Amino acid sequence: MNKNYYVIFTLIFLSFLSFKTSAQYNPEIVTVKGSTFNMGTEKNPYIETDEQLAHDVTVNDFEIGKFEITISEWELYTRDQKLKFPNIRYISKQSPIHSISWVDAVNYCNWLSKKNGLKPVYKIVNSQYVCDFNANGYRLPTEAEWEYAAYGLI
């Protein structure tokens, strides 16, 4: 799957590992019951090779955003962090954010975690982002969590 689409879709289904504190900084979440499912696909010339070879994967219970992160929510973040809002077209402030990078998405997760008094999940170690799955803050879903949710297996 194209990395840009993966970032967009994962942000759309932003996973959350905490409980609500403030409606302004806390999108509605749902709990997904974990299970085993068949992930990936068989050889297909239209599918990237890293998505091939279907195999069974087990995901644990996780939480995920019920709705997309909106333009309005992203504006709140960029304004608070004094960042430039992306030059994008949208229909309304309730439209989902798009055309952002994976780094933008994890920085948003850390910002949202801090706003809610939670431990940020992502940190930079040796110039690379590392995910601390033991932290109680917001994070993006893993590839398996995303695929499980995207297939409607929740």
Task: Identify the function of each model-found stretch.
Residues 1-9:
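Bacterial N-terminal signal peptides that target proteins for export
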Residues 8-16:
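Bacterial N-terminal signal peptides
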Residues 21-24:
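Boundary at the C-terminal end of the N-terminal hydrophobic targeting segment
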Residues 47-52:
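C-terminal, low-complexity/hydrophilic appendages and adjacent surface loops
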Residues 36-46, 57-154:
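Active-site microenvironments of metalloenzymes and redox enzymes
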